[in-house]
Amino acid sequence: MLLFWWWELGDPCAWTGKGRGTLKMSPATTGTFLLTVYTLFSKVHSDRNVYPSAGVLFVHVLEREYFKGEFPPYPKPGEVSNDPITFNTNLMGYPDRPGWLRYIQRTPYSDGVLYGSPTAENVGKPTIIEITAYNRRTFETARHNLIINIMSAEEFPLPYQAEFFIKNMNVEEMLASEVLGDFLGAVKNVWQPERLNAINITSALDRGGRVPLPIKDMKEGVYVMVGADVAFSSCLREVENPQNQLRCSQEMEPVITCDKKFRTQFYIDWCKISLVDKTKQVSTYQEVVRGEGILPDGGEYKPPSDSLKSRDYYTDFLVTLAVPSAVALVLFLILAYIMCCRREGVEKRNMQTPDIQLVHHSSIQKSTKELRDMSKNREIAWPLSTLPVFHPVTGEIIPPMHTDNYDSTNMPLMQTQPNLPHQTQIPQQQTTGKWYP
């Protein structure tokens, strides 16, 4: 099948004629053939198996460089590409990951990280994670499977657990093997255990923390839980002192003697440290006492009769509809009597009104009618107070003008508006004598 596909590429070989069955292949064709075969075998063996332990931190890095060779056109040897790549991870057959597994990738130009603490419920069950890589430039996709085989860690218990809050780290920075190794080394120097493992790492944002300001040195913060097989050291116990508890309640930094061993690289908030001793925890599990599985005798079951009496709803219908309808009808009749039968009428009102009041009212109506008739006549001369006093061009004082010798439609809208050439001049009234302003 592979040979057939190889020949479909287009006769990369040529007969030399020097011997039967002798083939000649160019170097470029040879390189293309080997790269194609390598790509096919890499896709066949793309599944990866990992074996984390239950209750111990699991970290798997999705490297962009590993997936770059999966997107066509396949890069040539020595060729460097920096395409943006994002990842989507989910449990096979489900839309999301298991509850204990988290994923983070800051930018399409950084590697993705799967991390979490496997639970004991999944021990012995392979967990298949589908990893889909997206090339944001070419829109090509590549899919790999990550098979997580969770191992049991009951033979190496870690009953003493401590959770630290590191203020100057982000979760992806803390997941780096070098940084996590430095932190575990500092904790081991303070705690002095025989075995020390990281149990879980959680971002402060997942605990309700605030998103930091976009400043260079501002970090989200991260919670790191570690477990050991020996009791807590005296330095870690200093947080439980009443003096340090009082300082923490006053939002002051407690005095810890071993803080200088972390301060060079990690800024720890000692007020948020949590110490858990599982050897002193009282088990709340109650053994279930199983009975015989027989229900107590409740007597003979009596089902309802098949012939049920039909219920008459006629009375309920009358009470529900007839009573409100009767009340509404009575109210309607009362309202009709008040509005129709209790009216006095105009004649009765005039008979009860004195004559002098009727005359006064009639005169008011007559005056109102005359004013309305006068307002309809628009041919009345303008009052002198509304005529212009100053000449619109020269600004000189002019005598009042009558409305019968000029056209009011050609008057300028503003007194400062100059007369245009096509505008008709307003005639002025000639005075017979000398006029004083």
From Swiss-Prot:
Q: Cytoplasmic face: residue ranges?
A: 339-437
Q: What tissues is it present in?
A: In both neural tissues including cerebellar cortex, striatum, cerebral cortex, thalamus and hippocampus, and non-neural tissues including quadriceps muscle, liver, kidney, spleen, lung, testis and heart. Widely distributed in the brain, with a robust signal obtained from regions with dense neuronal packing such as the pyramidal cell layer of the hippocampus, cerebellar molecular layer, and cerebral cortex. Levels are highest in kidney, moderate in brain and lung, and low in skeletal muscle, liver, spleen and testis.
Is rRNA processing found in the keyword set?
A: no
Q: Which residues are glycosylated?
A: 200
Residue intervals on the Extracellular side:
1-317
PTM text: N-glycosylated.
For this UniProt entry, which segments traverse the membrane?
318-338
Q: What is its main location?
A: membrane
Biological process (GO) annotations held by this record are: kidney development; skeletal muscle tissue development
InterPro entries, alphabetized: Cadg, Sarcoglycan_alpha/epsilon, Sarcoglycan_C, Sarcoglycan_N
Instruction: Determine if Nucleotidyltransferase is one of this entry's keywords.
Output: no
Q: How does it sit in the membrane?
A: Single-pass membrane protein
Give UniProt keywords alphabetically: Cell membrane, Cell projection, Cytoplasm, Cytoskeleton, Glycoprotein, Golgi apparatus, Membrane, Transmembrane, Transmembrane helix, Ubl conjugation
Q: Cellular component terms, GO, for this chain's entry?
A: cytoskeleton; dendrite membrane; dystrophin-associated glycoprotein complex; Golgi apparatus; plasma membrane; sarcoglycan complex; sarcolemma
Subcellular location(s): the record lists:
Cell membrane, Sarcolemma; Cytoplasm, Cytoskeleton; Cell projection, Dendrite; Golgi apparatus
Report the function annotation for this chain. Component of the sarcoglycan complex, a subcomplex of the dystrophin-glycoprotein complex which forms a link between the F-actin cytoskeleton and the extracellular matrix.
Q: Which family does it belong to?
A: Belongs to the sarcoglycan alpha/epsilon family.
- Name of this protein: Epsilon-sarcoglycan
Give the species. Answer: Rattus norvegicus (Rat)
